[in-house]
Regions:
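Hard-cation-handling environments
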Residues: 227-310
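Generic recognition of stable, solvent-exposed alpha-helical segments in well-folded globular domains
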Residues: 24, 45, 89, 127-130, ...
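Short, solvent-exposed loop/turn motifs
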Residues: 100, 264-265, 390
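Short, solvent-exposed aromatic-acidic interface loops
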Residues: 222-235, 384-388, 404
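General structural signal for secondary-structure boundaries
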Residues: 43-48, 124, 155, 232-237, ...
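Feature captures C-terminal
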Residues: 58-61, 65, 69-72, 77-91, ...
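Acidic, metal/ion-coordinating pockets
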Residues: 1-230, 270-282, 292, 346, ...
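Glycine- and acidic
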Residues: 117-121, 261-269, 316-325
Length: 448
């Protein structure tokens, strides 16, 4: 009578995940007993690798909002359903006791904007709320389930808007934005109420949803955001052995010491973090740049004070399939446009235009940001940290960065850049984080 659902971003985020192309996490999901999965960073591997992993996955991999391009289908690229064009199975029906529950999959809609399309050139993504409504109506008419649940990687705000515009969904169980939401959030729409849930990330919580289904309807439910205190849970011997076996061929490299730290190295804030600052500082130092830009990723584990930084630790912040670095001259006006564009992806008033992630991390500059302002007006007072000079719109600056989504950059992978920096530093202390001046967000618990 129980289903175990995985909200995505599971096959990526460590050295072994990168080196095995996600296979290590597929094996872990199988051991955990996952029933249904959706994706986002799963699609940062090549399409053939994604499909190979799905074949090895015991769980069903669902996505109602990924389609095979028409010209790709004409060239022989396979689809789950050639009539609809769905690349993957869009939904499934599960029988739990006497109840029949429909689960619809929703992948991250902006995957090919936020991540390289070159890895998955034959698939299109989108929110596809009209397709969602058509699918919900079809399931109701043809399958007549007792409950309809969407397993989503939209992000919390986008899920709330989808709950407003799509009717007939009972619950949306969401991922992507890493929000640990303590209660099921009710959203009214024209046919009733849809509850939106989000369970944080990285195994910190589980969403536990108990449904009381009687006579073909949900009579009542109980929602629990269950914290996971890993140190209090006895380790599973089978899982422990699996992890040890996965890591064994790489153990010497993973445990290789690089430097030490007297500060907590973390990636947690919407605008910055000490790990991100190290990456930004490394880009400036190793690349000889004035300014650095690093993506606003949310994944990665922390390193505690007085701990040795190992290569494994570094890879939890950088292990990805497009890690290449760059250094090039960029005009001040373009730097502002980059900051404005990322800010609009995050703070656009329309949740369907929010592409998720956190604000791009910066090194060598500080700035003021008003998230509630209009695009083009959010970023002001950009200043060079070293000299205190204001950024000149007409002047070119040497900018270093990594993780380009379009064309592949030609530089070394970012972990090599950061390792060089850390080895030179030997010991990390008194990190000065380039924190923007954030205005207009007092009392907003979602911005830190």
């Amino acid at each position: 009578k129980t289903l175990f659902l995985d909200g995505g971003d599971t096959w990526q985020g460590s050295a072994t995940a990168l080196w095995t192309r996600g296979k290590d996490m597929v094996g872990a999901l199988n051991l955990l007993g996952a029933d249904i999965c959706v994706g986002h960073w799963e699609f940062t591997y090549k399409a053939e690798e994604v499909l190979e992993n799905i074949k090895a996955l015991n769980a069903e991999f669902l996505a109602q909002n990924i389609f095979v391009k028409e010209d790709s289908m004409m060239n022989g690229v396979e689809a789950f359903d050639e009539d609809s064009g769905h690349a993957f199975k869009p939904y499934t029906i599960k029988t739990l006791g006497k109840a029949r529950v429909a689960i619809i999959g929703q992948a991250f809609p902006y995957t090919t904007i936020a991540n390289p399309q070159r890895f998955i050139p034959d698939w299109t993504f989108g929110i596809n709320e009209n397709n969602m409504q058509e699918l919900v109506d079809k399931i109701k008419d043809e399958e007549k389930p007792d409950a309809i649940i969407v397993l989503s990687h939209n992000g919390f705000d986008t899920d709330k808007k989808m709950a407003e515009v799509c009717t007939g969904i009972d619950f949306i169980l969401g991922g992507h934005t890493h929000d640990g939401v303590p209660e099921a959030y009710p959203v009214k729409n024209s046919s009733g109420t849809t509850y939106v849930c989000n369970a944080g990330s990285n195994g910190k919580f589980l969403n536990v949803l108990d449904l009381d289904i009687q006579n073909g309807k949900i009579k009542d439910f109980k929602f629990t955001l269950l914290p996971i205190f890993s140190d209090l849970i006895p380790e599973n011997k089978e899982m422990k052995k699996y992890i040890e076996d996965v890591r064994l061929p790489y153990l010497k490299e993973l445990t290789r010491p690089i430097a030490t730290t007297e500060e907590t190295l973390f990636r947690r804030g919407n605008f910055n973090g000490s790990w991100d600052q190290i990456i930004c500082d490394a880009l400036i130092d190793v690349k000889g740049a004035q300014i650095s830009l690093s993506p606003g990723f949310r994944w990665g584990t922390s390193v505690m004070p007085n701990q040795t930084i190992t290569f494994d630790d570094l890879m939890t912040q950088t292990a990805m399939t497009y890690p290449e670095t760059y250094a090039r001259d960029i005009k001040g006006s373009e730097i502002k446009l980059i900051l404005e564009d990322v800010a609009d992806n995050l703070f656009n008033e329309d949740p369907f235009l929010q592409q998720g992630g956190d604000m791009v991390r910066t090194g060598g500059i500080s700035y003021k940001i008003d998230p509630k302002a209009k695009i083009g007006e959010r970023i002001t007072n950009i200043v060079l940290s070293k000299t205190g000079e204001k950024l000149d719109a007409n002047k070119s600056y040497k900018v270093a960065g990594w993780s380009t989504v379009g064309a592949q950059s030609e530089g070394e992978p970012i972990w090599e850049t950061v390792e060089t920096y850390l080895k030179n530093m030997k010991h990390i202390s008194k990190i000065k984080i380039d924190t923007p001046d954030i205005v207009g967000v007092k009392g907003n618990p979602g911005i830190i």
